[in-house]
């Protein structure tokens, strides 16, 4: 690891790995909080390469890039790095499980994987001041999941934006709108954001489980959503709501229709959004279409459904109808991007050139989806269900 906390620019050059070595590897550099432009030159004089690049906690930055022996390709992207620090008297109240995440440490970490990762050089420099940052607020369906086989759309959407946009994912498993606020996570967002940045909020999964005086969709939940709106707009930011992803809960009679499990929470979010003129991405509707299109059995392919002993220390089958696997998260991220396009958000002009519009009624073939598992594995279900 290099210490470059007062970084202006640093560049690493590598000797190509041995021709027979295709193992994934990591590189980290100690930097201050902020956005960093990373430029990688992929390829090797010694071998053909197939390289996937991820950042921090499994954020997908580049899908597999193929290079012939002696061929080199250059790509740039923005990585957002943060720590729990807000002020000398205030920090984000992270959970014990988060303390091991790359998300909150003092380093910017890059992961190089794929069938044959090949890297010539990496350059890390502060991103231009005008870089637009999109801050994500939410729960386990949004968070940068640290371990396989779980994944969320927040760590996949990074793949679709070029070096003009940073994604800063502050979501965490098990959070409600209220606990997000109480743990100072919005305070951290506000401390990092500038005028014109975006804050995207998806809540509702865990909020419905709150059982105390004043809880409920139309009172406490709605009140907390209004807090997000007021604080973000006070700083000159743009706020967007995302209705919660559906759970895989089919009707018992025909196993063909998704049944509603979120009560009034999606409608409450829509009502607050309408009253306060907040744009809404209808992920609730798109994921319903997605699950119903895949069908009762194939929809399991998008979630953490795996037979016993698929992974080490997994004696029982995994049957999670809430949390996505990498394929499902990749598809949901495309739905969010389509929601941005439908809202005509200015940042969609920065989508990468290989973006193709997506229809959840015509999902990508899960049999064709390729994912190289990261080294961190934990089959323990994330907080929230």
What name fits each language-model region?
Residues 1-148:
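Compositionally biased, intrinsically disordered or flexible polar/acidic segments
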Residues 43, 56, 144, 156-160, ...:
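Structured segments of extracytoplasmic/periplasmic soluble domains
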Residues 44-46, 140-144, 172-178, 205-209, ...:
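Solvent-exposed loop/turn segments at secondary-structure junctions
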Residues 70-72, 91-93, 102, 148, ...:
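Conserved catalytic region of serine esterases and O-acyltransferases that act on ester linkages
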Residues 104, 115-117, 127-135, 141-231, ...:
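Conserved SGNH/GDSL esterase-like catalytic core that processes O-acyl groups on lipids
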Residues 121, 145-149, 180-181, 211-215, ...:
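Short, solvent-exposed loop/turn and secondary-structure capping segments
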Residues 189-192, 252-268, 297-306:
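Short, electropositive alpha-helical surface patch
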Residues 249-287:
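Substrate-gating cap/lid alpha-helix
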């Amino acid at each position: 690891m290099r210490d470059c906390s007062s970084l202006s620019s640093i560049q690493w050059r590598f000797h190509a790995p041995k021709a027979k070595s295709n193992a994934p590897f990591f590189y980290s550099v100690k930097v201050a909080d902020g956005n960093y432009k990373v430029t990688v030159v992929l390829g090797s004089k010694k071998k053909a390469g197939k390289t996937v690049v991820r950042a921090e906690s499994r954020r997908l930055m580049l899908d597999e890039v193929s290079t012939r022996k002696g061929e080199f390709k250059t790509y740039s992207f923005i990585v957002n790095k943060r720590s729990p620090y807000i002020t000398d008297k205030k920090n984000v109240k992270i959970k014990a499980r988060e303390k091991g995440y790359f998300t909150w440490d003092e380093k910017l970490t890059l992961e190089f994987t794929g069938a044959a990762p090949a890297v010539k050089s990496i350059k890390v420099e502060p991103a231009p001041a005008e870089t637009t940052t999109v801050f994500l607020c939410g729960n386990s369906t949004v968070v940068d999941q640290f371990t396989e086989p779980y994944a969320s759309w927040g760590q996949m959407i990074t793949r679709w934006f070029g070096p003009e946009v940073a994604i800063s994912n502050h979501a965490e498993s098990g959070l409600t709108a209220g606990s997000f606020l109480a743990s100072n996570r919005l305070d951290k967002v506000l401390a990092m954001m500038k005028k014109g940045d975006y804050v995207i909020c998806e809540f509702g999964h865990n909020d419905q489980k709150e059982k105390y005086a004043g809880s409920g969709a139309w009172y406490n939940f709605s009140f907390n959503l209004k807090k997000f709106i007021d604080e973000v707009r006070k700083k000159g930011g743009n706020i967007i709501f995302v209705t919660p992803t559906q759970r895989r809960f089919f009707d018992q009679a025909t196993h063909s229709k998704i049944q509603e499990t979120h009560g009034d929470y999606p409608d409450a979010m829509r009502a607050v959004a309408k009253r306060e003129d907040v744009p809404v991405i209808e992920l609730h509707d798109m994921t319903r279409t997605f699950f119903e299109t895949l069908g009762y059995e194939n929809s399991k392919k998008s979630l953490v459904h795996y037979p016993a002993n698929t992974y080490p220390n997994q004696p029982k089958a995994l049957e999670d109808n809430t949390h996505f696997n990498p394929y499902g998260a990749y598809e949901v991220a495309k739905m969010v991007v389509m929601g941005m396009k439908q809202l005509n958000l200015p940042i969609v002009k920065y989508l990468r050139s290989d973006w193709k519009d997506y229809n959840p009624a015509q999902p990508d073939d899960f049999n064709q989806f390729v994912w190289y598992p990261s080294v961190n594995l934990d089959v323990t279900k994330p907080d929230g269900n």
